[in-house]
Regions:
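Bacterial N-terminal signal peptides
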Residues: 8-17
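A cytosolic small-molecule/anion-sensing beta-strand core signal
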Residues: 90-91, 106-107, 125
Length: 146
């Protein structure tokens, strides 16, 4: 009986360690990280939709920071993901929808988006957003095949 209790305790104590070593996609996260310093002038803007481009500005398995540039009229298509997202409006004006709530946000404003919440935006004045994600968006690191 004592051996079984010790075995169960040992297994239960290892589970958090194993969980911390993998993202939701099962990929290891401990060794996944960006460079320490990321310079805007050296990063390409990646397409992220019509009139939308992005630069990944830093990440590890636990967090990611992404700069997103919108042309006027561009749409951040409504979507969900399991990540917590916090967005800071650097410039421009956007109509954001999070769940059933719709608000106009502008430079200096922020948006908190809980995991699995439907959200999207329409760019009313060209601008830039800074998106932070926890855990990182591993899907942003997958490059489409030509």
């Amino acid at each position: 009986m004592k051996t079984k209790i010790l075995l169960v305790f040992a297994i239960l104590s290892v589970i958090p360690i194993l969980c911390a070593m993998q993202s939701m996609t099962g990929q290891p996260v401990k060794k996944t990280r960006s460079s320490t310093f990321i310079y805007e002038k050296e990063k390409l803007w990646e397409p992220a939709g019509d009139g939308v481009t992005r630069q990944i500005m830093g990440y590890d398995g636990q967090a990611m920071l992404v700069k997103v540039k919108f042309e006027k009229g561009a749409i951040g298509t409504p979507h969900t993901h399991y990540h917590t997202q916090v967005t800071y409006v650097v410039s421009g004006k956007f109509e954001f929808t999070v769940g059933n709530e719709k608000q106009i946000v502008a430079a200096g404003d922020g948006i908190y988006i809980e995991p699995d919440a439907m959200h999207g935006c329409v760019c009313l004045e060209a601008g830039v957003l800074i998106d932070s994600f926890a855990p990182m968006r591993a899907d942003f690191l997958v490059k489409p095949k030509p």
